[in-house]
Amino acid sequence: MKNIATSLILTFVLVLNAYAIDVTITDFGAKTDADNNTEAIQKAFDHCSANGGGTVHVPTGTFNVSTIVLKDRVHLRLHAGAVLKAIPNPDLYRPRSVIAGINIKNASITGEGTIDGQGDHSNFQFGDGKGNRPHVVLLRECSDILIKDVSLVNSASWTVNLDRCDGVQVRGIKILSHGNHNCDGIDINSRNVVISDCIIDCDDDALCFKSEKEGYLVEHVTVTNCIIASNCNAIKFGTASLCGFRNIAISNCVIRKASESNIRKWKGQLRGISTDTTVLSGIALEVVDGGFMDRVVISNISMEDVQTPIFIRLGNRKGAGTLKNVILSGITARNESMMTSSITGIPGHYVENVTLRDILFDCTGGGEEKDASILVPEKENAYPENRMFGPVLPAYGFYVRHVKNLTFENVQCVLQSPDARPAFLFEDVHNLWLNNFQATTPTGQAPIVRLIGSSDVVVSGFRTQQTVPSLVKVEEGCKNIDIRLNDSGKIQKVQ
């Protein structure tokens, strides 16, 4: 019986292989000196599709194209030195992408070649959020898709758009896009996605999870072993958050500034930024459209040249949703602004159940005494961004407001230059455990930790080699504050 089953499987595989054909685009009329090879290449795809599937090979050379539509069971293979180059005519892209897959199964884009979106061409320069600018790759409502090893460069819009797909693997690709506005790296509004071993260098958000459709949940996604560079946010959830994000893990990634910055010039615009090229937020978790976030784990992340290492925001742009059950661990960062890492909800709607563990931040410093007393506006319905509260926050390490059930474990904030702000400011925070932590002593009389309107707080295990004038300042509206087991030998005033 076992031999019969094995024979049937082998027969099935042989039948499939018999129908899987290999074709080269030049066999269908594609030429390197042609103005437009779209029709010829599409014929190659259609031929494979009509014969049960196969592989379309792109040989060495540059081929001008507009939209190429992928087919079921047909694989695109770009050989070394092969380039599919977008024709700079916005009217030619239907759907709005150089490579498009709509409701297809079992297809791939692989090889050592390149797809060039020509996003820096003057014909695509419409401005931020405007114009019919094509993606490099658009996959909509597809399943069982592989994108591997290819280089995707110079997109006119988002480079890779994964829209409501189920079962996508993105492995070992390189993205370089700095020629236009909105040049995201990979946008994920899909399920069951694996992204690994990629190098992403782009002008807008590098990895962006978007929940763009009510009732469609973005879930079961893993990202690992990537190098991420951006002039905007490196790892972002939102801004679109209509339904939700659930069961997502990101690990073992390096975040750095982009290789170039042709649009954003940050130096001198905001205090504490000394270079034109920086990442806005290393990690930005945003729910502002009435959706939810649940069970997101981010670990082993090293970042440098980021304005704000961590930005977590529950807002009310189109409705107040929920943001809970988040773990961030093993994160190191050197920041490049006075816009502190923050975790903020809004009055009556709390960020809940967040753990930060094994965190080391090298903070810019430079805060003055007046900065420590800044009143931070709520801005409940504002666009979520690290600078939404202003260029300076009243703490140099973390500013936290409207949060319940928060754990900080083994968190270190080290100053690059003197700062008169406290390291941590917690306002309207309930059930907080701040344990086994370190921070550079602020100048003047600022405490390490400032508590406002907070309750059920445990501050323990503070360690220091410096003299600390004040460890914790407990202000109006606080109750059940437990300060214990700290390095009291260097602390002049505990509370």
What are these regions (language model features)?
Residues 7-17:
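Bacterial N-terminal signal peptides
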Residues 19-495:
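Extracellular/periplasmic carbohydrate-active domains that bind, remodel
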